[in-house]
Amino acid sequence: MLVVISPAKTLDFNKINETLPMTNPKFLKEARVLVEELKNYDSYSLGKLMKTSDKLSLLNKNRFDIWNESFDNSRQCLIAFKGEVFKGIDVGSFNVEDLFYTNDHLRILSGLYGALNPFDGVNPYRLEMGTKLSFNNYKNLYDYWGDKLKYKIIEDIKSTGDNMLVNLASYEYFKSIEGIDLIDTSVNIVTPIFKEYRNGEYKIVTMKAKKARGLMVSFIMKNKINNIEDLKKFDLEGYLYNEDLSNNNELVFTLEN
């Protein structure tokens, strides 16, 4: 079983974990191409491209200008990313065995790096997968990453010993690998969905759903889950599997108030 999630916009590079290895991202060469292209933008143009404030645009410009492939200013991405999903994962509660299992069974999709193993070292950056970066003959980042990212994820699924992909990424990021089950028909994609009962109906509450995705990552990694039936046993923070709302492709977990 392989799990995919989205990265976070929020980063914390103050913490250093020297006990864990730091590895090179698989698509470091491809990331370098993107960085070199983005260095051509001034902060104003970068802000328009990424729809960010002047302050954040200047920060991103500076980040791209000093980006490099050494580990001098890198952190393991699982440690560096923050936000609701990563709050739910709570990597600080993992033991060493959990961390190494996570490195084998989790991939973080990335606009800049394509796909990251948890121990992969990253520089501070922000580049969302949906950014409409057009250069050379590429229409956008989806076009840039194309089949090479899809085949990498298929390879990583196979490396876990089965054919299951658990999609805990947002659609913006999952879209970059959408269709891998058509390239390899043995791949089985399951998407957990988290809903809360409000005003007489079950609704997706965005912030809670994001944290729930992280909670499920934690549940899978700590319990070494490797099949759908055990996945359905997820029960953290009151969520329970709702068979009536689920189907073969979507596992719905609901929270009652």
From Swiss-Prot:
InterPro entries recorded: YaaA (IPR005583)
What processes in GO biological process is this protein linked to? response to hydroperoxide
Q: Which domain of life is it from?
A: Bacteria
An annotated GO cellular component of this protein is: cytosol
- Pfam families per the record? H2O2_YaaD (PF03883)
Q: What family is it from?
A: Belongs to the UPF0246 family.
Name of the protein in its database record = UPF0246 protein CLH_2088
| Classification of source organism | Bacteria, Bacillati, Bacillota, Clostridia, Eubacteriales
